[in-house]
């Protein structure tokens, strides 16, 4: 992952590193764009999954070579910093990955209220 540039993924690696990283999957061709993804600082986030540390769905920090921490995951989904999640680490990642971004839900709610007030 250290060789994947910000905003990049496994196909941005040299051919030798692609083969090493992807192993047998390398020869299947096509797809698999979710593997070895590094977030970008300048673009919207990739879709957050419920299992960020699995090879098929991993999301790497844009600068550091590590998975995103729970609080970073929550910030991407616009949860307030003081929001408390309950459960195991896996359960918390699942809650955040399954969530609709807070700011998006709020905007949809306000739009619905405006629409209903016109009826």
How would you label these PLM feature ranges?
Residues 1-119:
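C-terminal target-recognition/interaction regions appended to catalytic cores
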């Amino acid at each position: 992952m250290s060789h994947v540039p910000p905003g990049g993924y496994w196909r941005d690696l040299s051919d030798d590193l692609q083969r090493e990283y992807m192993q047998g999957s390398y020869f299947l061709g096509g797809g698999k764009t979710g593997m070895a993804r590094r977030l970008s600082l300048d673009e919207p986030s990739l879709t957050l999954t419920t299992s960020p540390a699995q090879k098929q769905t991993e999301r790497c920090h844009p600068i550091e070579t590590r998975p995103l921490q729970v609080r970073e995951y929550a910030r991407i989904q616009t949860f307030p910093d003081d929001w408390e999640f309950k459960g195991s680490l896996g359960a918390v990642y699942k809650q955040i990955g399954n969530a609709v971004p807070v700011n998006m839900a709020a905007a949809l709610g306000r739009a619905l209220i405006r629409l209903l007030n016109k009826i």
